[in-house]
């Protein structure tokens, strides 16, 4: 798991190793790579390809975290300082770029066009979701539909891709690939819905995050959208 991540992370540029290693070593639930590995196992995938793809997914996720923290001006994540708080915005953004490009190097190594297609579409969707979220910020008119579209693109699509590329790696028939994609999509939607609720209800000692960060950043998530709807 983490050993393979660290091995594939290495760069000749020391600062890239420092920043990328810092955020990966900070922990996290590894839900997205776990989705790849569990879906691949469920479909009987053989060989090392699922492990390689799990690293791809984790690198892309980590890149999005590096960029997100800069966009959101965040200085804490998982109870520790963010990379941008330690090294500055430029170092964090450029290290995120490195992780994106390294993930595509690994996909070329996998040499499966179907996997490349899914991941190219997913990374494009994530970027669109981030921009849509930016457009929604500080907008009291955001609807439930607009909110759901943001979480579908910025969160759910990577879970969807994780499950779908596992099915491709297992040489599963097209119907099973579609079913795995649908499962990943649902998992990602539920994950983000719960995460957004926890922003209002979680214990900071347990979650490692302060309460009300989304509200402070002007992000209208579903709890706020419902509250504003019911409160008028």
Task: Give residue spans per PLM region.
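Mg2+-dependent prenyl diphosphate-binding active-site environment of isoprenoid biosynthetic enzymes
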Residues: 6-232
């Amino acid at each position: 798991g983490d050993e393979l991540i660290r091995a594939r992370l290495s760069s000749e540029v020391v600062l890239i190793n420092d920043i990328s290693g810092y955020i990966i070593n900070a922990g996290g639930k590894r839900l997205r790579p776990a989705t790849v590995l569990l879906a691949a196992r469920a479909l009987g995938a053989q060989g090392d390809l699922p492990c390689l793809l799990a690293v791809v997914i984790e690198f892309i996720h980590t890149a999005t975290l590096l960029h997100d923290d800069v966009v959101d001006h965040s200085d804490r994540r998982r109870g520790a300082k963010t990379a941008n708080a330690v090294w500055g915005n430029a170092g964090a953004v450029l290290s995120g770029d490195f992780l994106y490009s390294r993930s595509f190097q690994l996909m070329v190594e996998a040499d499966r066009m179907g996997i490349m297609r899914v991941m190219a579409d997913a990374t494009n969707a994530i970027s669109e979701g981030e921009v849509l979220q930016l457009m929604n910020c500080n907008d009291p008119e955001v609807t439930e539909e607009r909110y759901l579209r943001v979480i579908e693109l910025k969160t759910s699509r990577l879970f969807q891709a994780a499950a779908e590329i596992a099915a491709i790696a297992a040489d599963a028939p097209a119907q099973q690939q579609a079913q795995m994609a649908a499962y990943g999509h649902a998992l990602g939607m539920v994950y983000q819905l719960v995460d957004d609720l926890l922003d209002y209800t979680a214990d900071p000692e347990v979650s490692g995050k302060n309460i009300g960060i989304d509200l402070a950043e002007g992000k209208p998530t579903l709890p706020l959208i419902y509250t504003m709807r019911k409160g008028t």
